[in-house]
Amino acid sequence: MIYLDYGATSFHKPPAVYRAVERAMRTCASPGRGGYGAAQRGAEAVFSCRETAGKLFDCRPEQVVLTTNCTHGLNIAIRSLVKPGGRVAVSGFEHNAVMRPLYALGAEVQVAGRHLFDWDNTLEEFRRALRAGANAAVFTHVSNVFGYILPVEEMAALCREQGVPFILDAAQSAGTLPVKLNALGAEFIAAPGHKGLLGPQGTGLLLCRGEAAPLLFGGTGSESIRKDMPDMLPERLEAGTVNVPGAAGLDAGMRYVLSQGSRIEAAEHRQIRRCARMLEKLGVQAFYGAHQAGTISFVPREDCEAFAQRLADRGIAVRAGLHCAPLAHESAGTLETGTVRVSFGPDAADWQTDALIKAVGNM
C-alpha cells in the first residue's frame, strides 16, 4: 500500500515507537499510584514524554497535558477560554473539532479570511473581526483539507495587540512546522500525538499557558482529600489513569521528529510541488499556493468518494469527502463536491508521487 493519508494519522512510524509501546506495556504500572518499581517506571515514562514535548514546543514539562487526541485538547481549551454566548474569531478553514464545541457553547462565531493561500485577506479580515469585539480567537495552523499554512505568528501578534486570548489548533503542523507555545503567546495549543508527532493513536497534547477548566473529574493520584480537582497542572486536567504505553510511544515519536530537524518539512514540500505540477499537466483541478504544507486537495471529474475507492483498489490510500471541515470547503467553493486529499508524511518520496500520478492519469 502507498499510504498518502498522513493528514488522518501517521501509519508508518519509526521502529522506536513500536518498541517503546511494547516496553511500557511489559514493564510499567500506573504512575502516581504506588512507590514500587513498576509504578515508578510508569511515572518516569510519562514525565519523559512531557520533557520531550517541552523541548519540541518551547514550554515547561508541567505545561504539557496528555490528552486522548487533538479534539479532546481543543474541547478543554475552548471550554476554558470561551464563555457561553461569547464572541469568537475563527479562520475560514476550521475543523469541526473547533466549530462544534463553539456551537455547543452558543458562541457568536465570526469567520475571518476565506481566501485560500492569501495571507493579506486572512490578516485583514482577522484584524477586522478582533476589532469588532471578539473576546477570544481560535484558529488552525494548517488547513487539514488544503494544506494552507495560515499566518499564525501575525495573527497571534494581532491578538496580543487587541488583548484577545487565543487557541492554536496544531493538528496538521505539530511535528512538521515550528510550533512554540511561549514564543507565540497562545493560551493553549492542542496537538494530536498520532499524526506529525508519529505516536500511537489515542494520544494527544494540550500545551497550557492559560487557566484551564477540567473537562473530566476523578482520581489523579494526588490531593485525594479534595472534593474538586487539584489546582496544579497537569494533574488538574488528567483525571484517571494516564495512557502510559501511548505516552511512551509518543515520546519516541517526538524524539524522532527532533532528530530530523527540517528534513520532514522539506521532503513533504518537495512532493507537494511535484504533485501539483503533475496534476496540472493532467488537467486536474488542484488547490496549490505559496503557503502550503504537506497536503494537497484536488477535484476529479467524477465523484470524489468513488475516485478515492478506485485509487484504493490500486493500492493507494487517500481521503475523500469533506474531511470533517465543511467550513473550509464552504470557503474554497467545494462544499458540494468535496475533494480528494493527498497528504504526505516523513517517508515522502518521488516514487509515491509518481505512482499516484500514473494511477490518476490512467483513471
Write out the residue ranges for each language-model feature.
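Pyridoxal 5′-phosphate
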Residues: M1-M363
